[in-house]
Amino acid sequence: MSFQIYNWLEKYVHEVVSTFGYRIWFIGVQGSYARGEATEESDIDVVLILDTLLPADLRIYRGMLNRLPYREKICGFISGREELENWSKADLFQFCQDTMPLKGSLDEIVAKLDMADVRRSS
């Protein structure tokens, strides 16, 4: 049976929601799977943004990831909303362009960007 990214992402989102619940601000996927260019060797670049990131959240998240199939393929990052919003606006533009939402939206971030941010991102 071959790897089915959409089934896997559905399971990932379910596990994240079960683990972090109302604290989730955004879940997304980046990289080759988001672009539709994945191969058998591709890793899974997942993004989780919580309302705030606590040190214990990293341990909890790692434990959650360890329960998922294809653990060896999972990479990406976890962050708090405030930390993300403090990135440079040029980096935020690139992040928003490269991330496919699975739960939540980056519209609030995009609304704060202007053409100067877009030009600086290239």
Predicted regions and their residues:
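Glycine-rich beta-strand-to-loop/alpha-helix junction loops that act as flexible
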Residues: Q30-S32
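Acidic Asp/Glu-based divalent-cation binding sites
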Residues: D43-D45
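Catalytic core of pol beta-like nucleotidyltransferases
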Residues: M1-R23, A34-E41, D51-S122
